[in-house]
Amino acid sequence: MTRVILVQDVNGLGSVGDVVEVKAGYSRNYLVPKGMAVRWTEGAQKHIGDISAARRAREAAALQEARDIANTLAKEAVTRELRLAANAGEDGRLFGSVTAANIAKVLSSASGHKIDRGKIEIDSPIKTLGEHTVKVKLHPNVKVDINVVVYAE
């Protein structure tokens, strides 16, 4: 049996930073060559400990920042109901659609926070005038619902 430190989550074995004992062949032929683990040494253990402590600090800071932005978005009237102008026909259908990039641009300028378009979740394409609800996923644990009102230019 060989001790290794996991540097990736491995199903059925453990998560990042765990010290596990595996058979020598599994370590030598699979885990280490694929970059999923490193051989256990005292130096490697200390290094992984430092990395995981820094990762936990970064994750805590990112979570707190996401919560602050979510509180700001929830409090501001401008971002609770975001208004977007779009070209539309007489029947209320848009020429094209409102995309996550459009929403992110307007939301960023309205709130003063940089919101990436990848954080905007639209359930179905917005192709009509009216009110639509979108989710802003600021962090895996922090989501904010925003009402988007699309009106004709």
UniProtKB/Swiss-Prot annotation:
Query: What Pfam families does the database record attribute to this sequence?
Result: Ribosomal_L9_C, Ribosomal_L9_N
The protein's UniProt keywords, in alphabetical order, are: Ribonucleoprotein, Ribosomal protein, RNA-binding, rRNA-binding
Transmembrane ranges, per UniProt, are: none
Question: Which Gene Ontology BP annotations are present?
Answer: translation
Q: What do the Gene Ontology cellular component annotations say?
A: ribonucleoprotein complex; ribosome
Question: Keyword Iron on this protein?
Answer: no
Q: Does the keyword NAD apply?
A: no
- Which GO molecular function, any one, fits this protein according to its record? rRNA binding
What's this protein's function? Binds to the 23S rRNA.
Family assignment from sequence similarity: Belongs to the bacterial ribosomal protein bL9 family.
Classification via PANTHER family: 50S RIBOSOMAL PROTEIN L9
Protein name according to UniProt: Large ribosomal subunit protein bL9
- The species is Tropheryma whipplei (strain Twist)
